Amino acid sequence: MDLPVVLIADKLAQSTVAALGDQVEVRWVDGPDRTKLLAAVPEADALLVRSATTVDAEVLAAAPKLKIVARAGVGLDNVDVDAATARGVLVVNAPTSNIHSAAEHALALLLAASRQIAEADASLRAHIWKRSSFSGTEIFGKTVGVVGLGRIGQLVAARIAAFGAHVIAYDPYVAPARAAQLGIELMSFDDLLARADFISVHLPKTPETAGLIDKEALAKTKPGVIIVNAARGGLVDEVALADAVRSGHVRAAGLDVFATEPCTDSPLFELSQVVVTPHLGASTAEAQDRAGTDVAESVRLALAGEFVPDAVNVDGGVVNEEVAPWLDLVCKLGVLVAALSDELPASLSVHVRGELASEDVEILRLSALRGLFSTVIEDAVTFVNAPALAAERGVSAEITTGSESPNHRSVVDVRAVASDGSVVNIAGTLSGPQLVQKIVQVNGRNFDLRAQGMNLVIRYVDQPGALGKIGTLLGAAGVNIQAAQLSEDTEGPGATILLRLDQDVPGDVRSAIVAAVSANKLEVVNLS
């Protein structure tokens, strides 16, 4: 069998290739060369890039086999995420690969600005020894304002606190209780401006945050404040900051990012009190290596059909360690629902009960859709394209939660309703410390069977000797029954049997079973 092709379009560390493993074929292409890229992508199952290669709609259209685009870094400016989503292509980045490097660089700028390191260095290199010109300011005992408490902002806050500073922060999306856990005083933006001796910005750039530190904001700061921006260019108005430094209101500043990059001309460059670097926040050997290995792991997971935590175009909410083990089980429940349905359902609902209901479980809706469509769609069904497939085929999907779960700590029910009103309902749970996947209910009938391997599901008219007839026919065909579960209908003469087998059932044996027990439904379902 041919190995999936991973196309690397930019320079990446050798550790990235090693992390991809030996179950893929790695190819290289000069990604910035458009002609070469378009010639190479048709055979690619995965495309790895950094910032030099542009992955737009044209590239995606030329890659019919493509399952994932992986950006070895944080930014995604060079990847058309919307076009990828429309084609069902997963897009991932490495959001945590550079967070330590970025946090350390912000601290380096803050320290350099507070102690006039760059000025003193230039003076001494000019053969001038004049200590009195470079009197700095301590961080100890000061108030440091962190604007944005994301991953990097939290790291900066923790490190600044170690200097003996009092840390305050502004972030409208962080709960006060969470800030308190971090030992940080949360407040409004204006209050932070008025109180902080140092301000370090750690926000994403959005229409709402662009120009956040402008002339008006700077006027609200304490005289002698020191400002650092190592997050995104354009968050700080560079002209307004330069004016504030010249006036003496802002003591010093440190910037690693600029509104337009590459940037070789700025009013800030004329000011000795301002320390500038050319967007070096992620420029460490460790960050670059980590970015490559992180996206390599995402590629490995995607090509194996598994959930990819760092996917940016999966509308499934945050997937934490409590929810992640349920993804595979719920996908299998979707497969079983499809097998027991006479037609593609008009609606699919996922109901989560018990302890799991308190988590963000939106991703389980996508898992159920993946299972449902995996048996009826020839192409790969992913967390990305499953919602689009449902919309195209008129299948509505919802997820609900409830606290009641009398027999299990948590249960997930997947319910499909056909256009004629007929219902198929499968429930499953994770059992014991090993989180064994189990089917616990089929159409209202209680079961207790592991959700694994080859399974034979039969609905038939209950009659004496039916199970013996089924076993005899399977045994004669050399098919071994590993486990069995039988449940009678609560109303009427019907029964449902679920058998786990060691192999598939030949077509003629299926027909013989249907005839022998008057089965009105027989399906073989692979839950491997």
Swiss-Prot record:
Q: What class of enzyme is it?
A: oxidoreductase
Q: Which UniProt keywords apply?
A: Amino-acid biosynthesis, NAD, Oxidoreductase, Serine biosynthesis
Q: Which Pfam family, just one, is annotated for this protein?
A: 2-Hacid_dh
Q: In which pathway does it act?
A: Amino-acid biosynthesis; L-serine biosynthesis; L-serine from 3-phospho-D-glycerate: step 1/3
Q: Where is the active site?
A: R232, E261, H279
Recorded hits in Gene3D superfamilies, A to Z, give: 3.30.70.260, D-3-phosphoglycerate dehydrogenase, domain 3 (3.30.1330.90), NAD(P)-binding Rossmann-like Domain (3.40.50.720)
Q: Which residues form the ACT domain?
A: 455-528
Binding positions (NAD(+)): R151, I152, D171, A230, A231, R232, D256, H279, L280, G281, A282
GO MF annotations, alphabetized: NAD binding; phosphoglycerate dehydrogenase activity
Question: Which InterPro entries has this protein been placed in?
Answer: ACT-like_dom_sf (IPR045865), ACT_dom (IPR002912), ASB_dom_sf (IPR029009), D-2-hydroxyacid_DH (IPR050857), D-isomer_2_OHA_DH_cat_dom (IPR006139), D-isomer_DH_CS (IPR029753), D-isomer_DH_CS1 (IPR029752), D-isomer_DH_NAD-bd (IPR006140)
Q: What is its EC number?
A: 1.1.1.95, 1.1.1.399
PANTHER family, per the entry: D-ISOMER SPECIFIC 2-HYDROXYACID DEHYDROGENASE FAMILY PROTEIN (AFU_ORTHOLOGUE AFUA_6G10090)
Summarizing the function annotation, the protein's role is:
Catalyzes the reversible oxidation of 3-phospho-D-glycerate to 3-phosphonooxypyruvate, the first step of the phosphorylated L-serine biosynthesis pathway. Also catalyzes the reversible oxidation of 2-hydroxyglutarate to 2-oxoglutarate.
What protein name is recorded for this chain? D-3-phosphoglycerate dehydrogenase
Which source organism? Answer: Mycobacterium leprae (strain TN)
